[in-house]
């Protein structure tokens, strides 16, 4: 398993580098890329945001292993994960309103403080302290995915008066480097866990200086900005109306809730499936992230002028890949017949599918959901998503250890088949919708049906 993990990591990384280099050579330079003021503004944002992302990714490979190292049972670990998911959905519902009221810069500093406290709790073996740490982690995650982006958009448009059309370029580059940071974080986590002598808690300790630097740079380099948004109740009410009045939005919500709840369960299960067979967890995690990066690169190539596939096609492909992978896992995790290499390959395919899924879903959401209703609609999307993930973990909590993992993958397979039916329903609804097609090189919607 050790050799398989390292060979897979090297092969995936080489594939990603080759695709990205060829894409960069073929890409024409844009006006935004040569604007010194814009580049400096991007740099001020990236140096804070990337530190926050690096600290977040550094903790991911060893979270389950840490709880296992503290001799908690799988059911107890499942409850810790459920607590984290529940706090994420609760804080996620109010995060945007909190950030707008408190201030985006202060919210980013608050993120660095709460996430540092979350890491400190990992030094304790007390179950209640770890539960508190998971709650703090949920708050921190909600702030990470709301405060930083909100700060950037306000500064970009209101303070610097750059064209709004340049915003996607910033976040596209951020998405790419987010994958790169995730790959590097897995290698770093493996190194510190193996060499420092602290064991699985080492990556959490190593994340604290990064978080402190995140808060310090935000305090020093960023200006404060606020936004008076409409009331939280009105935001949710408007989002619910949009969700129920447009079948496309409803189907997108169903697909997101089902697909991403399965991914949350995968995040919980990969460590207990591979760790008993001597897998280097940090390198395995980096391989996962490299597979996801490869999927994102393939998405960009597939939707380019040369191939011109549509996001709807790639969303369907992503779901099909996950269905196939989960069927593989159902057999490769059978008690007494475990095949860790086959399970590892299935996990890599799931991550590859995620690399196709997330940009496809982002494109479709952006086209289908009105900008004024996106916050409210996404809040409604997140509730069933996290509830399904929590339910799955609770079912696993009550299962027999020997058969529980296999049974959970069987349930996830059924969920993904349902997701595939929802994708087919969405495909039927939007097949004549030119708005949901990537524009052709001539600027006209691509002629063939979705």
From Swiss-Prot:
It is a multi-pass membrane protein. SUPFAM superfamilies: MFS general substrate transporter. Its main location: membrane. Keywords: Cell membrane, Ion transport, Membrane, Transmembrane, Transmembrane helix, Transport. The chain crosses the membrane at residues 1-21, 38-58, 79-99, 128-148, 167-187, 191-211, 249-269, 278-298, 311-331, 344-364, 376-396, 409-429. The keyword Transport applies. It comes from the Eukaryota. CDD domains: MFS_MFSD5_like. One of its GO terms (cellular component) is plasma membrane. GO terms for biological process: monoatomic ion transport; response to food; response to starvation. It is found in: Cell membrane. GO terms for molecular function: molybdate ion transmembrane transporter activity. Coiled coil: none annotated. Mediates high-affinity intracellular uptake of the rare oligo-element molybdenum. Belongs to the major facilitator superfamily. This is Molybdate-anion transporter. The gene is Mfsd5.
């Amino acid at each position: 398993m050790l050799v398989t993990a390292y060979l897979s990591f090297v092969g995936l990384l080489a594939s990603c580098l080759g695709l990205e280099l060829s894409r960069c050579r073929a890409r024409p330079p844009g006006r935004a890329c040569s604007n010194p003021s814009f580049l400096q503004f991007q740099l001020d944002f990236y140096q804070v945001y990337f530190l926050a992302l690096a600290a977040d990714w550094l903790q991911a490979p060893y979270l389950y292993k840490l709880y296992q190292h503290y001799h908690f049972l799988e059911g107890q670990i499942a409850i810790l994960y459920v607590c984290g998911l529940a706090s994420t959905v609760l804080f996620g519902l109010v995060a945007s309103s909190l950030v707008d009221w408190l201030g985006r810069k202060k919210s980013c500093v608050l993120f660095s403080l709460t996430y540092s406290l979350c890491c400190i709790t990992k030094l304790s073996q007390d179950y209640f302290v770890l539960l508190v740490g998971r709650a703090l982690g949920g708050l921190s995650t909600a702030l990470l995915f709301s405060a930083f982006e909100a700060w950037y958009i306000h500064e970009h448009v209101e303070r610097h008066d750059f064209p709004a059309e340049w915003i996607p370029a910033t976040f596209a580059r951020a998405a790419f480097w987010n994958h790169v940071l995730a790959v590097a974080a897995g290698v770093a986590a493996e190194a510190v866990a193996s060499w420092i002598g602290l064991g699985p808690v080492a990556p959490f300790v190593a994340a604290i200086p990064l978080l402190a630097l995140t808060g310090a740079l935000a305090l020093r380099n960023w200006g404060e900005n606020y936004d008076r948004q409409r009331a939280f109740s009105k935001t949710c009410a408007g989002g619910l109306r949009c969700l129920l009045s447009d079948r496309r939005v409803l189907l997108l919500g169903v697909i997101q809730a089902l697909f991403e709840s399965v991914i949350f369960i995968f995040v919980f299960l990969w460590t207990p499936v591979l760790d008993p067979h001597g897998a280097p967890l940090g390198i395995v995690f980096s391989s996962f992230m490299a597979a996801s990066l490869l999927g994102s690169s393939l998405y960009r190539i597939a939707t380019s002028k040369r191939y011109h596939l549509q996001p709807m096609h790639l969303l369907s492909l992503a779901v099909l890949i996950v269905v196939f992978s989960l069927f593989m896992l159902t057999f490769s995790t059978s008690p007494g017949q475990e095949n860790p290499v086959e399970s590892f390959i299935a996990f890599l395919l799931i991550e590859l599918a995620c690399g196709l899924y997330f940009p496809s879903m982002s494109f479709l959401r952006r086209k289908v959901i009105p900008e004024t209703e996106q916050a409210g609609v996404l809040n409604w999307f997140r509730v069933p998503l996290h509830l399904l993930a929590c339910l799955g973990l609770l079912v696993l909590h009550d299962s027999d250890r020997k058969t529980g993992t296999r049974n959970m993958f069987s349930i996830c397979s059924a969920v993904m088949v349902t997701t595939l039916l929802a994708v087919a329903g969405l495909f039927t609804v939007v097949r004549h919708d030119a708005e949901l097609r990537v524009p052709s090189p001539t600027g006209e919607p691509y002629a063939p049906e979705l």
